[in-house]
Each structure stands twice: as structure tokens, then as C-alpha cells.
Amino acid sequence: MKAQEIISSIEAEEIEKLKQNSKKKIPLLYVGDTVKVGVKIIEGGKERVQPYEGTIIAMRNGGINETITVRRVFQGVGVERVFLLHSPRIANIKLIRRGKVRRAKLYYLRGRVGKATRVKQRFDRSL
């Protein structure tokens, strides 16, 4: 058995454990979707959940290391954040609306401002 096969089998086992034990359900996500990600933040001695809402502009499928890049415009400045989907820091992921795009990566949205950054809504996939 090669090292890569061993690593992939261990990652598959860990993902199954996470799916069985975790209370958070990760919806089926696509590039272009608008999501609200609840991020656990510890301030002082208190822990709270901070929502981060934006459009998914990129996804990386890597088993346990699966990530999404979420972009939003805050006070006229574009802010992008990369989230590990299986991280314990992620409290929940809520799907707001589906987006209709023809690209796997939406990096072209970085060069656009205002209404040009909007993504059309997709109605043929359920929320």
C-alpha cells in the first residue's frame, strides 16, 4: 500500500466520523452560491458566532481539506475569506441563494464593482 493510499483512506475515515458525530450539516454547495458562514470567535473568555455572508468564488475539493473562498464587499472594499469546511471553527453554513454561473472560479469578480458583481439566481437547483 502506497503512502498516498494510506492518507486517503485515513481522510475518508475521518470524514465519515465527522458526518456521524457533527451536529452541523454542510449543504451541497456550488460556485456562485450565496452563503452565510457562522464562524466561532473567542473574545476574552466568551465564545460567539460571527456570521460572514458572501458569494462563493472558488472551491477546492481535497477530502478533509475541502475549502471554499467567500467574497463580499464591505464598505466599498472587497473582502475574501477562505474557510475549511470541516474545521471546528465553522459553526454552521446556511445557503441563502443559488447562483447561475458558467465558470469554476469566479476570480473575474475581483475586478468589478457595484452592480457588476451580482450573480444571476438559479432556480433549477433546490436550496
Swiss-Prot record:
Q: Write out the entry's keywords from A to Z.
A: Ribonucleoprotein, Ribosomal protein
Q: Does the keyword S-adenosyl-L-methionine apply?
A: no
One GO term in the molecular function aspect is:
structural constituent of ribosome
Q: Name one GO biological process term.
A: translation
Source organism superkingdom = Bacteria
Q: Name one Pfam family in it.
A: Ribosomal_L19
Give TM regions: none
Q: Name one GO cellular component term.
A: cytosolic large ribosomal subunit
Q: Decide whether keyword Ion transport is in the record.
A: no
By its UniProt entry, which NCBIfam families does this protein fall under?
rplS_bact
- Function as written in the Swiss-Prot or TrEMBL entry: This protein is located at the 30S-50S ribosomal subunit interface and may play a role in the structure and function of the aminoacyl-tRNA binding site.
| Family note | Belongs to the bacterial ribosomal protein bL19 family.
Name of the featured protein: Large ribosomal subunit protein bL19
Q: What is the lineage of its organism?
A: Bacteria, Bacillati, Cyanobacteriota, Cyanophyceae, Oscillatoriophycideae
